[in-house]
Amino acid sequence: MALMMKSSASLKAVSAGRSRRAVVVRAGKYDEELIKTAGTVASKGRGILAMDESNATCGKRLDSIGVENTEENRRAYRELLVTAPGLGQYISGAILFEETLYQSTASGKKFVDVMKEQNIVPGIKVDKGLVPLSNTNGESWCMGLDGLDKRCAEYYKAGARFAKWRSVVSIPHGPSIIAARDCAYGLARYAAIAQNAGLVPIVEPEVLLDGEHDIDRCLEVQEAIWAETFKYMADNKVMFEGILLKPAMVTPGADCKNKAGPAKVAEYTLKMLRRRVPPAVPGIMFLSGGQSELESTLNLNAMNQSPNPWHVSFSYARALQNTVLKTWQGKPENVQAAQAALLKRAKANSDAQQGKYDATTEGKEAAQGMYEKGYVY
């Protein structure tokens, strides 16, 4: 009887030990560096320049100004961006495409070194794009987990210190349970792999603007997606202090008749964040998602009119580059003017991050919409 009691006690002890081990928080070798990197990117008055367009998408941008899509033209445009004088005052990080990570200026200086001199943290797009998700109503899933650990290790060696993975969620097509879970689980696995390689993961489940849905439906979907995403990140022992989020703002669909101004967008977006995002997360870096330059800046400014538990900032591509590209036109003599346009937009969003943006200084071009239905990044 005593032996049975002893055995029972031993089994309970072993079971308790296993239970405790099962919930031990990860302790990776890069944890301190991840927290430091995330803090640098999420620094006051600064945000992210997203310049990670694929070569095909970059080609569309160049074609819009009559410039041929060659590696040299892509390099020249990217050099214009990263060498803008004083850019680091407003930009804390830049997301690069793989080609860009290894490119250099015309004088032979690596882009990553140019960025580091301005205290701009180099980042890298690591997903491999979207493909149709079987047995759903036109939804998609994101490729790129195969070999991601090796790629992240190589990107770290090349100077990258954060990563980005973009999945998308379509409201008109669902989202279905399978699409929502696939999106969330893929983001969680990516985040865990990136952290283990020393890269701060930017987590981006983009809820597309496509559709006629109202702002309440957008709120409902965003809350569901972020709940799933944080659940799976917790399961994968992702360290929340070493991640950044890149959500879409909570807005009505592009075809909804009931539009929402900055105050309402801010109200709904902050409501979603407070319900779903732990305060341990250092930074919320919003995507513009096809909003005009002016609209995306006004909405960000509205969200920073009162203190938030996180650094609420921007990670814009088109909303920073649209006027820049039109000013440049592929001509060397326009580089200085194009860089001035970039700095103007970067400063505007820096001011918005601090809640002190003044829209009276904007020109008509900033209000031009950039929404494209079914946009492929």
Curated annotation (Swiss-Prot):
InterPro entries: Aldolase_TIM, FBA_I. Its EC number is 4.1.2.13. One of its GO terms (biological process) is glycolytic process. Pathway: Carbohydrate degradation; glycolysis; D-glyceraldehyde 3-phosphate and glycerone phosphate from D-glucose: step 4/4. It is found in: Plastid, Chloroplast. It is an enzyme of class 4 (lyase). Keywords: Chloroplast, Glycolysis, Lyase, Plastid, Schiff base, Transit peptide. The active site is at E204 (proton acceptor), K246 (schiff-base intermediate with dihydroxyacetone-p). The keyword Transit peptide applies. Gene3D superfamilies: Aldolase class I. It comes from the Eukaryota. It catalyses: beta-D-fructose 1,6-bisphosphate = D-glyceraldehyde 3-phosphate + dihydroxyacetone phosphate. GO terms for cellular component: chloroplast. One of its GO terms (molecular function) is fructose-bisphosphate aldolase activity. The record marks Y377 as: Necessary for preference for fructose 1,6-bisphosphate over fructose 1-phosphate. Coiled coil: none annotated. Substrate binds at R74, K164. Belongs to the class I fructose-bisphosphate aldolase family. PANTHER family: FRUCTOSE-BISPHOSPHATE ALDOLASE. NCBIfam families: FrucBisAld_I. This is Fructose-bisphosphate aldolase 1, chloroplastic. The gene is ALDCHL.
